[in-house]
Amino acid sequence: MTRLLLRGRTLTFLRRPEGVGDVAALRYEEDGGLLLEGGRIVAAGPYAEVEAKAGADAEIVDHRPNLILPGLIDTHAHMPQMQVIASYGAELLDWLNKYTFPEETRFSDPDHARRIAGLFLDELVRQGTTTVAAYCSVHRASAEAFFSAAHARDMLTVAGKVMMDRNAPDGLRDTPQSAYDDTKALIAAWHGKGRQLYAITPRFAITSTPEQMEVAGALMREHPDLHMQTHLSENHAEIAFTLELYPEARDYTDVYERYGLLGRRALFGHCIHLSEREADALAESGSVAVFCPTSNLFLGSGLFDYQRYRRRGRPLRTALATDVGGGTNYSMLRTMDEGYKVIALSGEKLDPLGSFWQATRGNAEALSLVERIGTLDEGSDADIVVLDSGATPSMRIRRERITSLAEELFLLQTLGDDRAVVETYVSGRPAKSVLDGLAAAPV
C-alpha cells in the first residue's frame, strides 16, 4: 500500500479560537509533515520527525510554501440544484416553485441523477471540500446515484432523499409509506457502506403532512445514530405558511420538536428568525443551526446572528454551509467571506481563525464526526486541502504586506476561490489534480 508523505505549512485547530490572537487554539508547523497510509493520517508533526517515521519507500509530495489544512466541510447543500444555481429574481417560496421543484423532477431519471451527482462531487473537490451534508431529490434513484458516486470517490458524505408529500408538483411527491420504505431501503444499502452516512431528510414542514412527519420521527427512533436534516426559519413567508399548516404548534421549531426531530445529530438549515424559545429548544437539545450566508443574501431571507447565537446564555451549536443552489458558490472560502460580511452587518466580527476553525473542525464537531474528519490529528481520515495564498496576481500583491498567519488566512477567505486550491486529498489520495489531469509529481 502506497504511503504518501506531504510536506508544507500544516495548520489544524485544537478547539474554537477565542480571538485573532488565540494561537493556543491551533497547531501550526512552518515545516510540517503528514504521513498518509490506508486513507488515514498515521503521523503528523515537524517534517523531520515525520520523515524519520516514513521509511525510504514513502512517496514525497512537497507543497511548500503552501498551507496544508484539513479538508473543508460543507454542512448543507442540494445536489439536484446544480442547474438552477444563479437563477434570477425570487424569494424562497417563489424560487422553489419557479426553479427548484421543476428541476428536481428531472431526477426521476437515473441517468440524469448519476450525471449530476458525479459533477456535483467533482466540483466540491475542485473547491477543496471533502465532506458534504447533501439533500438529494425525492426520488430514491437520486440518493442511490449520489451515494454510488461518493462511494466510488471514497468521499465521506452525509445525505438522504428528501421526504415531501404535499405542496409540490406531480412527480415530486412521495407518500408517508413510500418515504418510509425508500428511506429504510437506502439506510440498509448505504449507511455505513464505506464512508457513506444516511440522513433522514424531511425537506421542511411545508412539504410534509403531519403523517409524514410522524414517519420521520419514527425513523429517528428506529435509527438514533443517524443524522436528520431539514430547513427552519429561513423566510418570513415560509414561517407564516408553516404555522398555517400546523396551527397547534407554538412556533416553527415546535413543529419539529413535537415529532422528535431535535437532537445532537439534527441539522437545521438557516435558523435566521428564531424566537428566544426556539433558540433555547435547539440549544437544550444540542441541535445545530446551519449558517448559509450566500443563500440568505441571494434570496433576501435575512441575516443569521452568528455571534449572538454563540454567546447567548444557552449557546447554539453552529455550522457553516454553501446551500447551493440557493447559495451562489460551491466554495467554502467564498462562503466564509460572505459569512464575515453578514456578521459585520450585525455589528460583530468573525476573525479568520474562527472562520477556518468553523469550516474544518467546527463543522466536523457539528456533524459529530470530529474523531474522523476536520483535523490533521494522527488517526484521522486523510481528507486534506492545500491552499496557495498567492494564487492570483491580486492575492500575490496583497501577500507582500502580510505579517501573520491570521492575515494570510483572512486573505485566503477574502480573495480566494478554487484557484487557491492547489490540491484536495480524499481518503489519502490526490483528487483535484486527477480531475484536472495535473497529478502532482513526487520529488
Q: What are the roles of these predicted feature ranges?
A:
Residues 1-54, 66:
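N-terminal metal-binding scaffold of metallo-dependent hydrolase/deaminase domains
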Residues 83-113, 161-176, 235-265, 288, ...:
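Active-site gating loops and adjacent loop-to-helix segments of metal-dependent hydrolytic enzymes
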Residues 85-155, 179-193:
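Alpha-helical scaffold segments that flank or form the walls of functional sites
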Residues 141-271:
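Metal-coordinating catalytic core of metallo-dependent amide/deamination hydrolases
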Residues 154-156, 220-225, 261-264, 281-290, ...:
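Glycine-enriched alpha-helix->loop->beta-strand junction motifs that scaffold or abut catalytic
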Residues 258-265, 307-396:
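His/Asp/Glu-enriched, well-ordered alpha-helical/loop segment
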